[in-house]
């Protein structure tokens, strides 16, 4: 990203304006020869408590548990005598065992109070300077000695080396007895085989059917049912379509019957979901219609009966009017 694309603060803008007045341009360095810095110094907020030169990746590279084990093991000597086994501590190593990475600078004898380096000693005649090694020798020797002090580096092995040392055994204890823990993988393979046996054939049939449809799209006089019958694929399209049509007819009949009943009563009923009684009545009416279609003679008699029934309530109304 260029410096222009980054949002600049008000202080940065003010400083650039002042520099432009004196002939400065973006991309040029400071100074008479223009060989200075080209970008302004930006403040970085320090959010941790680490000091200068701290390596945050040291916790991943330094195996402190390995170092502590090897350090304690090297400070102990085990000897077998006639009386038995004796364990003694080595007197030469007085340094404490810690989980921090050992460094040569911390163990330097010239360090005073753990923070200052001794440079000279005061005598009556003057100062006696301390001889210091050259910078090149000290840098090379310090790096090598730091690696020697790190006892965990001696046991850094790759996975292949560890497998060879362990004789091909893995971490779990069952591998020592020849158990490879492959039961889960075998179960997964069996599940995949069963799945392919069930659904793989159907997918193949569907693919063949789609290919057949694509081939026969341009042919005249070919229906989908004919294609399915030629291939021998079991389909229920015709059966499902006929059932769907029957259901539509039944719904239309029920709606027409409801409208007729509402017109006879003189008011329109609100559209509500049919109850159980309404469903039963509709079924009875359908059965009656079927009987009428089967026996045409009964159809002629029914209107007379219905007319008689329609006349009876009129007579009752007349009687009521007379009584009034």
Swiss-Prot record:
Residues 14-30, 186-215, 254-270 have a biased composition (Basic and acidic residues). Residues 244-253, 312-324 have a biased composition (Basic residues). Residues 11-57 form the G-patch domain. It holds the Pfam family G-patch. Residues 1-30, 123-324 are annotated as: Disordered. Residues 131-141 have a biased composition (Low complexity). This is G patch domain-containing protein 4.
């Amino acid at each position: 990203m260029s410096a222009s694309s980054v949002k600049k603060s008000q202080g940065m803008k003010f400083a650039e304006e002042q520099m432009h007045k004196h002939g400065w341009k973006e991309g040029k360095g400071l100074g008479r020869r223009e060989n200075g810095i080209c970008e302004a110094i930006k403040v970085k907020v320090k959010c941790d408590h680490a000091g200068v030169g701290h390596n945050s990746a040291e916790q991943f590279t330094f195996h402190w548990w390995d170092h502590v084990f090897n350090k304690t093991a090297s400070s102990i000597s085990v000897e077998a005598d006639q009386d038995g086994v004796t364990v003694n501590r080595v007197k030469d190593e007085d340094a404490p065992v810690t989980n921090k990475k050992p460094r040569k600078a911390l163990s330097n004898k010239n360090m005073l109070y753990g923070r200052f380096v001794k440079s000279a000693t005061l005598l009556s005649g003057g100062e006696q300077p301390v001889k210091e090694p050259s910078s090149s020798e000290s840098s090379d020797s310090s790096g090598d000695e730091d690696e020697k002090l790190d006892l965990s580096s001696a046991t850094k092995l790759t996975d292949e080396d560890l497998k060879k040392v362990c004789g091909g055994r893995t971490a779990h204890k069952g591998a020592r007895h020849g158990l490879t823990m492959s039961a889960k993988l075998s179960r997964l393979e069996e599940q995949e085989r069963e799945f392919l046996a069930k659904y793989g054939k159907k997918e193949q049939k569907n693919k063949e059917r789609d290919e057949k449809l694509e081939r026969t799209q341009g042919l005249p006089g070919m229906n989908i049912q004919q294609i399915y019958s030629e291939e021998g694929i079991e389909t229920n399209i015709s059966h499902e379509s006929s059932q769907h049509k029957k259901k539509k007819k039944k719904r239309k009949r029920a709606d027409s019957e409801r409208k007729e009943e509402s017109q006879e009563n003189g008011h329109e009923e609100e559209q509500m979901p049919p109850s159980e009684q309404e469903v039963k009545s509709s079924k009875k009416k359908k059965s009656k219609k079927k009987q009428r279609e089967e026996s045409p003679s009964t159809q002629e008699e029914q209107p007379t009966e219905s007319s008689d029934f329609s006349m009876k309530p009129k007579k009752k109304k007349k009687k009521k009017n007379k009584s009034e």
